[in-house]
């Protein structure tokens, strides 16, 4: 199972690097930072579906 360590998030600003991840909500997040911020916002209910676009 793919996983991402979001322990050092949330962060106030994310870089613009494009390394897409697909969340369990079927949304494509542009990079780990954006994904991890969303994970924190979801109180941990959002998980990684897979790396790459959904």
UniProtKB/Swiss-Prot annotation:
GO MF annotation list: serine-type endopeptidase inhibitor activity
Subcellular location: Secreted
SMART domains with a match to the protein in the record: KAZAL
Residue ranges of domain Kazal-like in the record: 4-54
Site (Reactive bond 3) residue list: 16-17
Protein name, UniProt field: Ovomucoid
Glycosylation sites noted in the Swiss-Prot or TrEMBL record: 43
InterPro entries (UniProt xref): Bifunctional_prot_inhibitor, Kazal_dom, Kazal_dom_sf, Prot_inh_Kazal-m
Written domain comment of the UniProt record: Avian ovomucoid consists of three homologous, tandem Kazal family inhibitory domains.
Keyword Secreted: yes
Organism of this sequence: Anhinga novaehollandiae (Australian darter)
UniProt xrefs under Pfam families: Kazal_1
Recorded GO CC terms: extracellular region
Disulphide bridges, residue numbers: 6-36, 14-33, 22-54
Keyword DNA repair carried by entry: no
SUPFAM superfamilies assigned to the protein according to its UniProt record, in alphabetical order: Kazal-type serine protease inhibitors
Signal peptide: none
CDD domains in UniProt: KAZAL_FS
PANTHER family in the record: OVOMUCOID-LIKE-RELATED, SERINE PEPTIDASE INHIBITOR, KAZAL TYPE 2, TANDEM DUPLICATE 1-RELATED
Keywords: Disulfide bond, Glycoprotein, Protease inhibitor, Repeat, Secreted, Serine protease inhibitor
Chief localisation class: secreted
């Amino acid at each position: 199972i793919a996983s991402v360590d979001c322990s050092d998030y949330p962060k106030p600003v994310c870089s613009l690097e494009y390394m897409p991840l697909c969340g369990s909500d079927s949304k494509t997040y542009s990079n780990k930072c954006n994904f991890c911020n969303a994970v924190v916002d979801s109180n941990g209910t959002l998980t990684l579906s897979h790396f790459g676009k959904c």
